[in-house]
Amino acid sequence: MNKIRKLAALAVLPLVATLVALPAQAAERPSCPAPSKAEVRRSSADKVDKPARGATAIKGVRVDHIPKGFTYGQVIVNKHDGIVEYGYQWSDDRDDASRRHRALWVRVVCWPKATSLAQLKNAPFNIGSFSGDTTTTKVGDRRVLRQKGDGALGAGVYTGWVERPGVVVTVMASPPLVPGLTKIIKGIRL
């Protein structure tokens, strides 16, 4: 009888180990999507993807609504001042000055101090600060900071929100994409 109990206990061990390991793995997952070493190298080398990547272009982020018409894309990674900026920029072949130029930039910023929307106005981003006239709007369940794009970002609309403490998401859409910006924002999942 003892041998049968031992065998039964040994047979159950792999199942128990699997059940116990899953919650432990979930606890180890980073709360903010981080670029792989390969993505950091691609960004440093200014590698271009032709054709552009799809909904999972940013590891750990899903962009469910990407408008059509993009011909290339590029990973953008920037590490500075204790934060990591990680994003993807989709674009078409039109000149940047063209009013029909299509560009979309989705970025996740791992910034441990980020807890509220008001902090985005003084965020230490290298590109894309909320320094102009901003408005707060609601998109789905998210409170979003919005401003007109200018300067290095180009024309269009620049938006951002705190997804959860320490995680900021920003989206820059060129003028032809602005009518669908709400759908783009609603489709972003971390």
Regions found by a protein language model. Give the residues of each.
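Secretory targeting and sorting signals
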Residues: 1-28
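Short, solvent-exposed recognition patches
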Residues: 29-156
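Feature captures outer-membrane beta-barrel proteins of Gram-negative bacteria and organelles
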Residues: 160-162
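Surface-exposed amphipathic alpha-helical segments
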Residues: 165-190
